[in-house]
């Protein structure tokens, strides 16, 4: 699927310049870059949460797009009811709660959860529905290593089962190495380099990419 280019400007200053790209169903695209590089702005524009400068459609045709923000604000009802907002398949809901280790929280008010618990609930909710494109913004940032690994396995499973192009915003280069098929590197609001994971993480062409990877120890 073709994603058209777009920009985002705040107070006359361009903070994002995305030239567009092709997304392939069944692949995971990790979006990396330093803080303030435009990763979350890219995710929000792509998901339609904030408006890009250019009016029109992002895709060459109609696709369903899902989005999980970096910080979720659940409704003041039970965890299982929050998850059910994503879909009505009770068996699927229970399977996801079990895998994400939140079954014991099913009846608890979702607005009383910890950050990590809220993130797992939000993941379960978004995984209830099949999307053509799913955008996850730092979904495992509040999780420990074990739960992050479980969540990563679910991302890969969801992507393959649904034929979904999954766009993962992450601050963790190790996570990008583990789950991504392709990597997008943003630098000061620009998509500096994109390609296969092996190319971007181990043989980058752009000097900004090389400096970033050297600094963060890949």
Regions found by a protein language model. Name each.
Residues 109-113, 117:
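Conserved ABC ATPase signature
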């Amino acid at each position: 699927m073709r994603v058209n280019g777009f920009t985002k400007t705040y107070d006359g200053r361009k903070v994002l310049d995305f030239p567009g790209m092709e997304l392939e169903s069944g692949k995971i695209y990790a979006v990396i870059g330093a803080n303030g590089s435009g990763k979350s702005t890219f995710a929000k524009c792509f998901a339609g949460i904030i408006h890009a400068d250019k009016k029109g459609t992002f895709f060459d045709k109609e696709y369903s797009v899902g989005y999980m923000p970096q910080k979720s604000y659940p409704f003041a009802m039970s965890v299982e009811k929050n998850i059910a907002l994503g879909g009505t398949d009770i068996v699927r809901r229970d399977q996801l709660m079990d895998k994400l280790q939140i079954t014991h929280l099913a009846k608890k008010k979702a607005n009383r959860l910890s950050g990590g618990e809220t993130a797992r609930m939000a993941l379960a909710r978004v995984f209830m529905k099949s999307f053509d494109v799913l955008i996850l913004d730092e979904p495992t940032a509040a999780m420990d290593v074990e739960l992050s690994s479980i969540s990563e396995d679910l991302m890969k499973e969801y992507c393959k089962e649904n034929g979904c192009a999954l766009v993962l915003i992450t601050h963790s280069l190790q996570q990008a190495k583990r789950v991504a098929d392709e990597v997008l590197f943003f630098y000061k609001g620009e998509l500096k380099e994109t390609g296969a994971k092996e190319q971007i993480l181990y043989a980058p062409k752009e000097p900004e990419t090389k400096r970033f990877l050297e600094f963060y120890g890949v």
